[in-house]
Design a protein with these regions (language model features):
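Cell-envelope/extracellular polymer assembly enzymes that use nucleotide-activated donors
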Residues: 10-12
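Catalytic-site signature of metal-activated, phosphate-bearing donor transferases
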Residues: 69-75, 81-82, 86, 93-255, ...
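Short, well-formed alpha-helical segments that are part of the catalytic scaffolds
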Residues: 14-33
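Active-site acidic short loop of glycosyltransferases
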Residues: 8, 33, 78-81
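Acidic helix N-cap motif at the loop->helix transition within catalytic regions
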Residues: 22-25, 46-55, 95-96
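A conserved acidic beta->alpha catalytic loop
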Residues: 30, 41-50, 87
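Short, structured coil segments at secondary-structure junctions
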Residues: 33, 54-55, 134, 157
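Conserved donor nucleotide-binding strand/loop of the catalytic core
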Residues: 49-79
């Protein structure tokens, strides 16, 4: 997809997908101004790829291992030097679009840029619990690579990083069923990451840490000001900490059982 703006370095928007037919059209509409849209799909069985084909001819299939590995494989496939990574449940606002185009026209003085995210939970904006959510998503193709982690990996950037003013919209949960399935996957990956740093799960991992997560988000980050949505988010977040360590305990038990006696 060619942009109407040709007086700036060309940009590839990279979108990883898996069964995102409910989200993908709105996402693609928000980035159709880009010089290239690159969709990297990990085996969708719904209409995701069919819808994506209306916006781009570059739809690549790649087996999914984890988010970081998928994106690290996809980044070098971009045709242009600047890459913007957008998830299917995110939207680039017109203001953010114009800011990115203006930045590329002017000539970026950084190798990458952080973007704030405004998160929505069940359609409701969350202004406190996730207030300081940010991610490095706009960067030079040859300067950025995700850390080798199963989940919540950051980009290791070779060069200075700047900030963009306008946020990315993130619609993180449209149904509890999908949200819980997502958290089930994430806590499994997080347990595998934690296994490298936590040799043994102890009682405080299963009690104190989930409780502190709830206190931190609901009280210190003023999640109570987000109403019922804030309470639910903080409760689910605390539960995800519990599940991460419970799954790590399970992994450690299996290793103990596999040891020769």
């Amino acid at each position: 997809m060619s942009s109407a703006h040709q007086d700036h370095p060309p940009l590839t928007v990279l979108i990883p997908t898996l069964n995102e037919e409910e989200n993908i059209r709105e996402c693609l509409e928000s980035v159709k101004w880009a010089d290239e849209i690159l969709v990297v799909d990990s085996g969708s069985t719904d209409r995701t790829c069919e819808i994506a084909a209306e916006y781009t001819s570059r739809i690549l299939a790649h087996e999914y291992v984890n988010s970081a590995a998928q994106k690290n494989w996809a980044i070098p496939q971009a045709a242009h030097p600047w890459v913007l990574i957008v998830d299917s449940d995110e939207r680039v606002t017109p203001e953010l679009r114009d800011e990115i185009i203006a930045l590329l026209r002017k000539g970026p003085n950084c190798a990458g840029y952080h973007i704030r995210r405004v998160n929505h939970f069940m359609g409701q904006p969350v202004r406190h619990v996730w207030k300081n959510d940010k991610c490095l998503r706009l960067f030079l193709r040859d300067k950025g690579r995700y850390q080798d982690r199963q989940v919540h990996a950051d980009i290791d950037l070779k060069g200075p990083a700047g900030w963009l003013k306008h946020p990315l919209l993130h619609y993180t949960c449209r149904s509890f069923e999908k949200y819980l399935l997502k958290h089930d996957r994430y806590t499994t990956w997080a347990a595998r990451d934690r296994a490298k740093r936590t040799p043994k799960v102890r009682w405080h991992h299963l009690t104190v840490r989930p409780a502190f997560r709830f206190f931190k988000q609901y009280v210190l980050k003023r999640g109570f000001l987000d109403g019922r949505a804030g309470l639910i988010i903080c409760g689910l977040s605390a539960f995800s900490v519990f599940m991460k360590y419970a799954k790590l305990w399970e992994l450690q038990q299996r290793k103990d059982l596999d040891k020769p006696h």
